Amino acid sequence: SLHDALPIFVEDESLTVLVTTTYMEEAELCQKVIVMHNGEILSQGTPEELSLKAKDKCFVIKPPIGINPRILQARLLDDSHNIIDAIPEGGEVRFIISSPEAFKNIKKIYSSVQIDKIDSRLEDGFMILLNEYKNKNEYSENKIYISNLYNEFEKSNTLEISNNPKKSKEIDIEVVNLVRKFGDFTAVSNTSFQVYSGEIFGLLGPNGAGKTTTFRMLCGLLPSTSGFLRS
C-alpha cells in the first residue's frame, strides 16, 4: 500500500514527503503534523506532542443495558458545557471532557455506569485545538499563519523554492501522452505535463478523473498502458 511505500521512499531515497489528509490515523503515521482549520494553522508538532493536549481528558463509558451507544453519544454531545467530543467505539462511547470539574459532573450524572480513563491520541488533541479555536472571540497577534510557515520553508536549507521554477530549466517530473486502460475502460487518457525543480504541483479533478491512477504510475506502483513518464 501507499502507507507502506512512503516510509521506504523517505528512508531509502532521503525524500521529504508532504501528506494532506483528514484522517487522524493517517496523520499519526507522520513524523510531524500541522493541524489546520479554515486555512489557519492551529498547532504543529509530533503526533505524540499534539496528543498530550488532551492528556487526562479522555474517557470511555459503558452504556446502560438496553441503551444504544449512539443514544448515549447524543446525550453526551448535548452537554456541550462538560463534553468536547463523543464517539461510539467498540460498544462503548469515547468522550473528551472540557475540564476536571466537568468529569465530576459527568460522574454524578452517570453514577450507575462504568467510566474508565484512557490514553489520549492525535484525534483527541485535534478536538481540543478545534474547541479552543471555536471558543476564541479575539485572535491572538501571535497566531501562526500559512504565510509564516511558507517563510520558514523558504529560508530553510532543506527546501529551496524558486520564484519562477521554469527558469531553472530542470525538469523533475515529465509525463507525455500517458495512457492507462483497465480492459475497455480508459482511466487516464493522453495526459501530458512537466514539473520543474522547486515547483509545487497538484492534480485537480472530480472522482474518476484519473488523479490517483496517474500518481500510482508516477510512483511505480502501476504500469502505464502507453506513453512516457519520468519521475
Regions inferred by a protein language model and the residue ranges of each:
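Short, small-residue-biased leader/transition segments that mark boundaries at the very start
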Residues: 3-6
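ABC ATPase "signature
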Residues: 44-45
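Short, charged/small-residue-rich alpha-helical element at the C-terminal edge
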Residues: 56-136
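Walker A (P-loop) phosphate-binding loop of ABC-type ATPase nucleotide-binding domains
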Residues: 206-210
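Helix-to-loop junction immediately C-terminal to a conserved catalytic motif
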Residues: 219
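Conserved ABC transporter NBD signature motif
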Residues: 227-231
